[in-house]
Amino acid sequence: MGVRAVNPNAKVYVEWAGIKDNDIEAKFQELGINCISDQDMITPKKSSRKFGLYINDDGMVKHLAMPVWHWGAFYEKLIQSILSGSWKKEEEGDKVSALNYWWGMSSGAVDIIYGGGLNSETRKIVDLVRHSIIKGEFMPFSGELKNQAGEIMNKADETLDPDEVIEMDWLLDNVVGKVPEYDELSDDSKLLVMNQGIIDVNE
């Protein structure tokens, strides 16, 4: 949606790191794609400069932007909710599951930082959108949204609620690619989706 706002004719090519034997970098090089949104942050097992949104010119990485999580703000709000009694839980027999917390930019728990590759004029535009999201004046998941089959998934005067966003199993009509099948995933990815309950697994 962000890409379409800048260029309505642009296409987003999606590849999944969790698929077995998937050489994403080679595919993007073959297609001439050099603007990439990669993993959100550096991980201990895979230290790399390729994270966040960046331009990859023949192996030279130029960072544009990346998300950041302020865990101090998150835990502060979590503890405050417990002390105030607003923290809730659902019990199912001997199982206890905490409710989801929809804390975004307006809470201070999530933000965005800019890389050296993002010019000052573009930063002004991103800042404008960022402040609009924080104030609730701009909702990214609003307006008419169509899936790859051309079906309307959200009407022009509607906004997807958080549950609908997190449960999205479809891709926008400007996206090239697909959601992988369970059997296409690597063993680590299969374990992740089963533990997180991201998809229903039929044995």
Residue ranges: model-predicted function:
Residues 1-203:
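A residue-level marker of the well-folded mature domains of exported/periplasmic proteins
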